[in-house]
Amino acid sequence: MSKIGINGFGRIGRLVLRAAIDKGANVVAVNDPFIDVNYMVYLFKFDSTHGRFKGTVAAEGGFLVVNGQKITVFSERDPANINWASAGAEYIVESTGVFTTIDKASTHLKGGAKKVIISAPSADAPMFVCGVNLDAYKPDMKVVSNASCTTNCLAPLAKVINDNFEIVEGLMTTVHATTATQKTVDGPSGKLWRDGRGAAQNIIPASTGAAKAVGKVIPALNGKLTGMAFRVPTPNVSVVDLTVRLGKGASYDEIKAKVQEAANGPLKGILGYTDEEVVSTDFLSDTHSSVFDAKAGISLNDKFVKLISWYDNEFGYSNRVIDLIKYMQSKD
């Protein structure tokens, strides 16, 4: 397994490291100019959402040592100055949220990185969603995007529905947990005024490109889906509401059967299925991209349905980052 570096040790960076440990992937370096190694230990050890790290973590001689393994720590602001090669890091997770274009993310290559995986949507980098379009990956691609957590939830479900019943058109709403870009109390927020309102006090309508991005990973759905978000005052776990018009009529039971078939088959581990009386906290630290809620969906008639799917927007997504890297490594 090739060695991994992480740029940006925030929510996703830290959880990618947790996911890497769970999956036996080898992280050898972390870069973050705003956090020293002792602070990294603290932030990695204690997590208000996912709980304490169950292994050991310490700082020794400038290294971050997790479960006895030394991880090199850099503190460079400019990705071009990170000497990834000195740590042997070849696949870089770009999780700052800042360097999200091919031009900006490819500066990592100057320090010896071979590939860069952006943990966010990208305006120009090829986007991949595990279980949906990994076969489009080519070894000559240097910079790729793992899309967004919401696209990772929506795309596998949309694929199953479109493959079996044909999506004519659809609208998506994600009821989305709070993220780090929001404000604890009302504050300025550039052009998106509503986004600046207190996260703990409000349900905030917001934009999302997640549904349109599905058209990039499933070309047959290009122009057929769009969506919006409601930001809600919960710390983690979000839920997608996909309302679609179908080309081929189907009962809700037939739809459930096809989703369950995919969840137990080709999309196992990516798409989950539940028929229990679940609520959002039941999905904390769930590793699926998407868990279909059979009891929450509704059907108006055989061609117009509302489908519901849950996702841990932090940890499910972080697991897919590692899965994408593992897939790339198998092809490179």
From Swiss-Prot:
Catalysis: reaction(s): D-glyceraldehyde 3-phosphate + phosphate + NAD(+) = (2R)-3-phospho-glyceroyl phosphate + NADH + H(+)
Predominant location: cytoplasm
Domain of life: Eukaryota
Binding site for NAD(+): 11-12, 32, 77, 313
Residues annotated with Phosphotyrosine modification: 273
Keyword Magnesium in annotation: no
Protein name per the record: Glyceraldehyde-3-phosphate dehydrogenase 2
Organism encoding this protein: Drosophila melanogaster (Fruit fly)
Lineage: Eukaryota, Metazoa, Ecdysozoa, Arthropoda, Hexapoda
